[in-house]
Regions:
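Electrostatic, structured charged patches in enzyme active sites and in nucleic-acid/phosphate-binding
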Residues: 1-150
Length: 150
């Protein structure tokens, strides 16, 4: 007996699955792995503990002719609006370090990451940034943090 054709849903560029562990909802399995590695090494950190404003919001008073952000809709004046701030929430914040686990970056991440690096350099000069992209790099990150804490 032939199975009926099942149409696959189109997925976006980021294909991470949401995972729960210890009562915390993680955005990906890699974030959960990092949390477990930090916990096993007894390194204190907060998961998504703080949100940083990379660029303040403002009121755009000029006229601007464009379509909606999704490229649809009518081409018309969409100016004179409040522009929202650009914010960034790293995955883990600890004493002297910030960790951003990133499997596959989305479209806006590279720009946010550069702006965040600039903010850290100016406001937190003695903070080390880590961006592990797989479990091996998560383990290496924990090793580096432990050697730094000694």
């Amino acid at each position: 007996m032939k199975r009926p054709y099942k149409r696959k849903r189109k997925r976006g560029p980021v294909q991470s699955k949401k995972v729960s562990y210890d009562g915390i909802n993680f955005a990906s399995g890699l974030e959960r792995y990092m949390y477990m590695a930090l916990k096993n090494a007894k390194i204190k950190s907060k998961y998504e503990g703080e949100t940083f404003v990379l660029l303040n919001g403002f009121h755009f008073e000029n006229e601007v002719y464009e379509r909606c952000a999704n490229g649809k809709g009518e081409y018309k004046n969409r100016g004179c609006k409040r522009i929202l701030p650009i914010k960034y929430t790293p995955d883990f914040i600890g004493d002297g370090f910030i960790i951003e686990t990133k499997g596959r970056a989305n479209e806006s991440f590279p720009m946010r990451w550069k702006l965040f690096k600039q903010l850290v350099m100016r406001q937190f000069p003695n903070t080390t940034l880590y961006k592990p992209q797989n479990q091996k790099e998560c383990d290496e990150t924990v090793r580096l943090i432990l050697s730094y804490l000694k």
